[in-house]
Design a protein with these regions (language model features):
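A short, proline-enriched helix->beta-strand linker immediately N-terminal to the Walker B motif
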Residues: 148-152
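Helix-to-loop junction immediately C-terminal to a conserved catalytic motif
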Residues: 49
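Conserved ABC ATPase "signature" region
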Residues: 107-125, 176-180
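Short coil-to-helix segment of the ABC ATPase nucleotide-binding domain corresponding to the Q-loop/switch region
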Residues: 89-98
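Conserved ABC ATPase signature
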Residues: 129-133, 137
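Hydrophobic anchor residue at the start of the ABC signature
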Residues: 143
Length: 216
């Protein structure tokens, strides 16, 4: 069930955003894409998610041509650095939204949402409005929504960058526990960061990118 990127090139202007990227990601592992701002991290994640089409190259997942699969059919979840939630919905409704879109069984939705809420430490916050939550809590909602989907690929684009130091430290530790647990052993986790110390603390494989090219 590995995710394989082969010779991915994306050059929308006179500069490469992705320059001949070839990578292999295995399930049950945490990968950190480390690079400065505008190094190509977000572009790489968006390409995997299907939000951006490369000029050339290929992506294979589960022995299928991933580039040929529409975005809405890819089993991918993405957490952004901005707190992206549905402001008109409460915490529980935010988390269950993608499951209802899939028309899943209500009992299964209830269980998956309850499990996700428990994992991110939001038990008791189910009826809270998004506007009533702190930045850290809002990011937990976004993470819980991704976990409830049970996506096979979870992409995290600098998810802690807009939080204060104490919140970053706490959530980083929770990420490590979540992504190394047995329940998530079949998923691939790719985390983008500009911070070398954060990359080391996450205890995963570190991939360095600069000017759209993999350095190590």
């Amino acid at each position: 069930m590995s995710l394989n990127l082969g010779n991915i090139i994306f050059k929308p202007t006179d500069q490469y955003h992705l320059n001949d990227i070839s990578l292999n990601f295995e399930p049950g592992k945490m990968y950190t894409i480390l690079g400065r701002t505008l190094s190509g991290k977000t572009t790489l994640l968006k390409t995997i998610a299907g939000l951006q089409t490369p000029d050339s190259g290929n992506i294979q997942f589960e022995d299928k041509d991933f580039l040929a699969i529409p975005v809405w059919e890819r089993n991918v979840a993405m957490v952004y650095q901005q707190f992206i939630n549905y402001p008109h919905l409460n915490v529980k409704q935010n988390i269950e939204f993608p499951l209802k879109q899939r028309k899943m069984d209500p009992d299964i939705i209830e269980k998956e949402v309850s499990d996700a809420i428990q994992k991110v430490g939001l038990k008791g916050f189910e009826a809270r409005k998004i506007q009533e939550l702190s930045g850290g809590q809002q990011q937990r909602v976004a993470l819980a929504r991704s976990l409830a989907k049970k996506a096979k690929i979870l992409l995290l684009d600098e998810p802690l960058v807009n939080l204060d130091y104490k919140l970053r430290e706490g959530l980083r530790e929770e990420f490590k526990k979540l992504f190394t647990g047995s329940e998530t052993s079949q998923s691939i986790f790719i985390y983008a960061s500009t911070d070398p110390l954060e990359a080391m603390q996450l205890n995963g494989d570190i991939i360095v990118i600069d000017e759209g090219k993999i350095l190590q």
